[in-house]
Each structure stands twice: as structure tokens, then as C-alpha cells.
Amino acid sequence: NEDANVIKSYSDVGVDQFKYGLELDNSIKADQEGHLEGD
């Protein structure tokens, strides 16, 4: 079982939203984003 290395990642976190993602050298990509809702 080889360890995968992160070849690209980013994060952008704001007051009411966030977005982040990464890409691994074993061809796996993950992206996530969301919005925070308050009063």
C-alpha cells in the first residue's frame, strides 16, 4: 500500500462561505464547498 502524495491543494475561506480541494498523485480529486447561513 503506497502513500498518495498531494500534488495540488487550495482553500478559500470567507466570512460566509468556504471552498477547498485537493488532487492526489493516484488520480483522486476532492472538492468541497459550502455556504454558512446565519441570522
UniProtKB/Swiss-Prot annotation:
Residues 15-39 form the Chitin-binding type R&R domain. Keywords: Cuticle. GO terms for molecular function: structural constituent of cuticle. Component of the cuticle of the larva of flesh fly. This is Larval cuticle protein SC6. The lineage of its organism: Eukaryota, Metazoa, Ecdysozoa, Arthropoda, Hexapoda.
